Amino acid sequence: MRPGAGSESPSDVGCDVLHVDMDAFYASVAVRDRPDLAGQPVIVGGQHRGVVLSASYQARAVGVRSAMPMTRARRLCPRATVLPPDFEALSGVSAAVLEVFRTITPVVEVLSLDEAFLDVSGARRRLGSPAQIADQLRARICDEQSITCSVGVAATKHVAKLASRQAKPDGVVVVPAGEETAFLHPLDVAELWGVGDKTATTLRRLGLNTVGDLAHTPLPILRRALGPALSAHLHDLAWGTDDRIVVPCRGPEEPERSIGADETFSRDTDDPAVVVKELLRLSAKVAGRVRAAQAAGRTVTVKIRFADFTTITRSRTLRDATDVTAEVYQTASDLYLALGLERARIRLVGVRLEGLMDAAKATRQMMFGEREHGWSYADRAVDQAVMRFGRAAVTPATLLDMSRPG
């Protein structure tokens, strides 16, 4: 499925979505600036405590993974060179790569420092087929920044994202329009965008181990296990159905399109219950601010800062934009729990809702167990009570016995 650079590829007709993902970004930038480490196992993160932010492919070959506790990573790869993240260098490379994207197309949706979606439908006449554009991008990024990236080319965002994973490292995978199911169905069910550890466990208990298994399971069975909204969403993705478009990120002159909040604990904590409760409080705060701005957002981002001041973020893009506290919190807590940080000492947590749009233009599906507009109406009732009586008037029961950090 990988076309050669500069070649015509009839298989990419209709495949206007590119997902571009830098390869082992933090580690690649570190090695770029330390040529003596080329080809060696490198881990980026805290020296002793904290977690792995990134690992070179040589370190990954022995099992080192992002978000793994550093003590375990050192046991797996004692020969690895451990380096702290150079956020100034990372930000500079990320900005330069974004400028490369914008010379290709203005329709760029940035997901993080090291990945983005591009809609190249308007660039075909000028630059060639999507597969050719993907090769041009890779060549420019390698020439200008001395790092590699992988590109998935497909008709939809979901398939393009999965294709870029298959392309790693330093490759291009094209999934021809109409051949999505042949690509998707052999994949592990956990590969589906939106399937976290908890959902994957539920699916495996049903004997659903591949995307194809899920696709061929009757919806009523999936609904009983996952609820109506998630089951329908995953069933659509399993059949290659994804109507989400590439949403351009803001330019430098445009207003901020996210709202967030974070909290520093008075003492570092390794108690997941304390972290989850704080995520609930922050989710309520962020969602309230979003509603006050008459907005809604599609991407929930969680920030975790460890005792050694290393920081990681994890994001998930929802099917529909939301301003609902319960949805923000559920996603934020899932992102945190999926990291498995039970023994890591945490100094700060944050929640951010990104990709904001006018709430009047946003649509949303109901959550599992939610009556029509239930959570939305409940949030607005809380907002009215807070406006009238103050923020202490309405507090989630879970927070009543919580010792606030700071």
List the predicted regions and their residue ranges:
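DNA-contacting surface of Y-family translesion DNA polymerases
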Residues: 10, 184, 191, 199-346
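Short, charged/polar surface micro-motifs in flexible loops or helix N-caps
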Residues: 25, 49-51, 307-311, 356-359
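Short, compositionally biased low-complexity segments
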Residues: 68-76, 106-113, 209, 247-259, ...
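Short, hydrophobic beta-strand segments
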Residues: 116-122, 313-316, 358, 363-366
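Acidic, metal-coordinating catalytic segment for phosphate/diphosphate chemistry
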Residues: 320-406
